[in-house]
């Protein structure tokens, strides 16, 4: 008999939320979660800007749109119930020129279609009342957007999973997976674990976990590092809340933006440059295996061929603080080079 009904690989917020939800849907089910690090939420879940996204950008009716709108409501309810620090502060999406006004109006329509109530289109004068130092000519105010302490969410999910009878095993790197006798067997350096159902929530390593489980790896993870600057102490007040540019649908990134952090301070960024390791939070983090995996993947080269200018600009921005600052000045013209210093990074 298997040790667990559900064997989950990956202790980020997706794996933890999956485990907790399974326990809620099937009370009494046996859940075992395997996490390779010494604690949960150590990678993407702990290396992000802490934004609660509300689903503004997604195609109405799409799974992303439905889940984003539903998810932010559930996350806010969860945080309120658990006493986790969060704030629904809203955000501004700013049009910097006439060309972006049409896309801004389209976003307004899309947001309403996705069920986001209270969206406001602000002309420049009204926009400056909300954010006195912002540039641009118009903005959307989206009240649903917020900020949260995601590592605290991960810790609380882990606590509840264990309280409900689940098992969270840390320091358990999955090195092998096989299906045998109607159950899955996960091998780690120190033990083997069994489960009737296997759930892959391994984040940046999910393609490799799928491969060792016997799936053909047609898609690969190509790591991109998002680097942030932060506003220096005493200059955080230049920006009050969250400020985003109007996204360009041609590109897969939102562009640099300003994010107020839940524990204080203000971040600006990120850029998006290829990382040399899947856990490459520093420029000096290099994994030859990860680099080989990325460089031999045709999908990467198709992406570069499709977006050569953007690829070059993002790489330039990675190594040039001045270039990064110029990108920020499109949203807040009064930002100076001396106002920013290196912050965190995510992959």
Where are each of the predicted segments found?
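Beta1/beta-strand and adjacent pyrophosphate-binding region of the FAD-binding site
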Residues: 1-14, 32
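Conserved Rossmann-like nucleotide-cofactor binding loop
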Residues: 14, 39, 205
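Flavin-dependent oxidoreductases
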Residues: 17, 177-287
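Glycine-rich FAD pyrophosphate-binding loop
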Residues: 23-46
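Dinucleotide-binding Rossmann-like beta1-alpha1 core, especially the glycine-rich loop
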Residues: 50-126, 136, 256, 277, ...
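Short beta-strand to alpha-helix junction loop
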Residues: 59-70, 94-104, 140-160, 169, ...
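Flavin (FAD/FMN) cofactor-binding core of flavoprotein oxidoreductases
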Residues: 125-128, 220-224, 230, 234, ...
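Helical element adjacent to the flavin cofactor pocket in flavoenzyme catalytic cores
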Residues: 140-197, 201, 205-208
């Amino acid at each position: 008999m298997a040790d667990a009904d559900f064997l989950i690989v990956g202790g980020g917020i997706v794996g933890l939320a999956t485990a907790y939800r399974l326990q809620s849907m099937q009370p009494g089910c046996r859940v075992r979660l395997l996490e390779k690090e010494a604690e949960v939420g150590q990678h993407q879940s702990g290396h992000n800007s802490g934004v609660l996204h509300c689903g503004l950008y997604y195609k109405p009716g799409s799974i992303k749109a439905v889940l984003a709108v539903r998810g932010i409501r559930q996350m806010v309810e969860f945080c309120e119930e658990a006493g986790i620090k969060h704030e629904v502060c809203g955000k501004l999406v700013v049009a910097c020129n006439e060309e972006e006004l049409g896309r801004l109006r389209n976003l307004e329509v899309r947001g309403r279609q996705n069920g986001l109530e209270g969206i406001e289109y602000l002309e420049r004068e009204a926009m400056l009342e909300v954010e006195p130092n912002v540039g641009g000519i118009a903005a959307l105010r989206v009240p649903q957007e917020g900020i949260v302490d995601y590592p605290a969410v991960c810790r609380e999910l882990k606590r509840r999973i264990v309280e409900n009878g689940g098992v969270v095993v840390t320091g358990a790197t999955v090195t092998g997976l096989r299906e045998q006798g109607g159950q899955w067997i996960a091998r780690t350096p120190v033990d083997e674990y069994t489960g009737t159902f296997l759930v892959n929530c391994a984040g940046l390593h999910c393609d490799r976990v799928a491969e060792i489980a016997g799936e053909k790896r047609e898609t690969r993870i190509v790591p991109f590092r998002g680097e942030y600057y932060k506003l220096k102490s005493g200059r955080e007040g230049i920006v009050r809340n969250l400020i985003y540019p109007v996204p360009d649908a041609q590109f897969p990134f939102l562009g640099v933006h300003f994010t107020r952090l839940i524990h204080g301070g203000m971040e600006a960024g990120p850029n998006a440059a290829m990382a040399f390791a899947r856990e490459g939070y520093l420029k000096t983090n290099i994994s030859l295996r990860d680099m080989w995996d990325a460089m031999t993947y045709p999908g990467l080269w198709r992406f570069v061929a499709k977006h050569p200018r953007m690829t070059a600009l993002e790489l330039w921005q990675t190594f040039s603080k001045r270039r990064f600052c110029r990108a920020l000045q499109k949203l807040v013209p009064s930002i100076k080079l001396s106002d920013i210093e290196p912050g965190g990074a995510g992959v």
